[in-house]
Amino acid sequence: MNSLYIAGEWLAGQGEAFQSLNPVTQQVLWSGEGATAAQVESAVQAARQAFPGWARRTLEDRISVLEAFAAALKNHADELARTIGEETGKPLWEAATEVTSMVNKIAISVQSYRERTGEKSGPLGDATAVLRHKPHGVVAVFGPYNFPGHLPNGHIVPALLAGNSVLFKPSELTPKVAELTVKCWIEAGLPAGVLNLLQGARETGIALAANPGIDGLFFTGSSRTGNHLHQQFAGRPDKILALEMGGNNPLVVDQVADIDAAVYTIIQSAFISAGQRCTCARRLLVPEGAWGDSLLKRLVEVSSTIEVGAFDQQPAPFMGSVVSLGAAKALMDAQAHLLANGAVSLLAMTQPQAQSALLTPGIVDVTAVADRSDEELFGPLLQVIRYADFAAAIAEANDTAFGLAAGLLSDSEERYQQFWLESRAGIVNWNKQLTGAASSAPFGGVGASGNHRASAYYAADYCAYPVASLETPSLVLPAALTPGVKMA
């Protein structure tokens, strides 16, 4: 199977064979071979050759290609949504919203480029001070599996708009979505070599990240892989590295008047996408006492009725599956480990079918666990921690190396202002689900959650670098010379 797209041609990979599977049925959806290091090098050379011509095109020319890509996405919206649902397990209604986000990214990126990285000028003495931006050159984009269309798109679109050429390495769990997305770019008329698709697993990724011919790497994925990349790029200030990783995100619940509103917001924060959004609430901080007990009782009651099912099930489920049987096993093992170390199950996460990656929502009270691991459990397993007072809640919320998202459910604006001020996170919400984010706002975190604000409005900042110029059309000897210089 021709699984790679290099220099405008579909080619068979020469590396390790792999497949993508429907996580519910285990049906084979895609099969092919990954790119070898030699094929990665060929793709890098193709991108390098294509870069000057693409970068020299006018901005309007590049925008026209991006707009044609948006049109192609719309033309293939149903097919793309179904492919996303099949490979990730997310319900069709959610997959359709992902395609819509991909389309909307075009206009947002164009607006962002004009506002953040366009050209600005003004007088400075007898010259003109000009600020322009230039593309880095050849950049690699590593995509995740949870939003295999939208999140890589959030790097690729602004990178191409700025004039870079791109090497796209998608998750090995979602190669079919990546292939279909690249075909939409081809349909849009993107020149050969400007975007190259390198399918493959770990070895392909290692070869691409280590290739000396890339000028930068834009990554969305796990903190473990992101940390490896950060170490690999250490001592290389000549290469731009943008990392958007996960989080051990806290959602603090104050004693609010509307318990059902709190419960609904918690569910949307913890269990949407089967808990596979990097902004999902991982830790739920609940006050000690009778009110907190009532909240948890209602949360368990409602969560136990959440519909879980296949991506195309009708009526539509709220939750689909996690991405693979391996992911399901890791989550079930994590739950067992917590329970063995003193946690109390409030709602058991279960795997109804052994050969299916469908999991039911789980809620576990970990307050009594002495050494809680600061890790992202990427799935529908919510950890509850009881707190004595608001100061203790904020301290607990910040007790993590991550810093992606944090939220507060409270009727007190004063408490929110305190929470916002003292929270260490790139996204801080008040009375809204943690998983709600606007593409027009910066998306990303601090600490172990990453550096730049990847895949959103602020992506323009790392897709081009600023060039400051002082310009005047004529070279003129100044009337007053610097002391100590004589032209006589």
Curated annotation (Swiss-Prot):
Q: Which residues bind NAD(+)?
A: G221, S222, S223, R224, T225, G226
Which Pfam families does the record associate with it? Aldedh (PF00171)
Highest taxon above the source species: Bacteria
Query: Catalyzes what?
Result: N-succinyl-L-glutamate 5-semialdehyde + NAD(+) + H2O = N-succinyl-L-glutamate + NADH + 2 H(+)
Q: In which pathway does it act?
A: Amino-acid degradation; L-arginine degradation via AST pathway; L-glutamate and succinate from L-arginine: step 4/5
Question: A Gene Ontology MF term for this entry?
Answer: succinylglutamate-semialdehyde dehydrogenase activity
The free-text function statement in the UniProt record for this protein reads: Catalyzes the NAD-dependent reduction of succinylglutamate semialdehyde into succinylglutamate.
Q: What is this protein called?
A: N-succinylglutamate 5-semialdehyde dehydrogenase
Q: Which organism is it from?
A: Pseudomonas fluorescens (strain Pf0-1)
Q: Lineage of this protein's species?
A: Bacteria, Pseudomonadati, Pseudomonadota, Gammaproteobacteria, Pseudomonadales
Which gene is annotated as encoding this protein in its UniProt record? astD
